[in-house]
């Protein structure tokens, strides 16, 4: 027997996501109720210029209660193509654009959210500023690629999506590590 979803109830609808309670029959036949954060999906972008500088953003994150160093990222609009979202987000958050290639995808925390994230490497960067969200206060920070991986070893980068993105992009970034 497999997990069987029996019913879903919306218990909260917010600006970005909603919360559902999901009635499930477990593989052993017993019932269970799960809380699920239903999310439209998101993207993370790893922007790297021709000199091997990575573009990060530093911003306050309410869940962490402090400023974090992160790759540019954003939430997709309903039915938005992930690549189009990535193109928009990198411009809004860093003021740069370039050629984007997908380096992977992942589920952020599948134990409680449906959020699926697509990860893109942006190269051949050029200025292309777009106005960002009114509630975002970001500082763009550039760091050489090889320094970024030293920072990871020293536990100075602790945003999960950023760490995953940097791991998936590593094969594309080795040329900047010499």
Model-derived features: where do they sit?
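A generic structural signal for well-ordered coil/turn residues at beta-strand boundaries
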Residues: 13, 18, 41, 113-116, ...
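Short, solvent-exposed loop/turn elements at beta->coil junctions and helix N-caps
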Residues: 8-11, 104-109
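Nudix hydrolase/Nudix homology domain
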Residues: 30, 67, 78, 111-112, ...
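Short loop segments at secondary-structure junctions
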Residues: 27-28, 49-51, 60, 123-127, ...
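Conserved Nudix-box catalytic region and its N-terminal flanking loop in Nudix hydrolases
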Residues: 2, 34, 43-88
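The catalytic Nudix box helix
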Residues: 56, 71-102, 120, 134-135, ...
């Amino acid at each position: 027997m497999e997990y069987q979803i029996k019913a879903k109830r919306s218990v909260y609808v917010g600006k970005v996501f909603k919360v559902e309670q999901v009635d499930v029959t477990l593989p052993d036949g017993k019932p269970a109720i799960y809380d699920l954060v239903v999310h439209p999906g998101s993207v993370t972008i790893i922007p790297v210029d021709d000199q091997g500088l990575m573009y990060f953003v530093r911003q306050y994150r309410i869940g962490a209660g402090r400023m974090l160093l992160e790759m540019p990222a954003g939430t997709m609009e309903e039915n938005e193509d992930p690549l189009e979202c990535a193109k928009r987000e990198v411009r809004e958050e860093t003021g740069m654009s370039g050629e984007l290639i997908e380096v992977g995808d992942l589920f952020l925390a599948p134990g409680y959210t449906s959020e699926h994230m697509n990860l893109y490497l942006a190269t051949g960067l050029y200025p292309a500023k777009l106005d960002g969200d009114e509630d975002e206060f970001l500082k763009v920070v550039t760091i050489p690629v090889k320094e970024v991986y030293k920072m990871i070893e020293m536990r100075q980068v602790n945003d999960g999506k950023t760490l995953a993105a940097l791991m998936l992009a590593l094969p594309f970034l080795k040329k900047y590590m010499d």
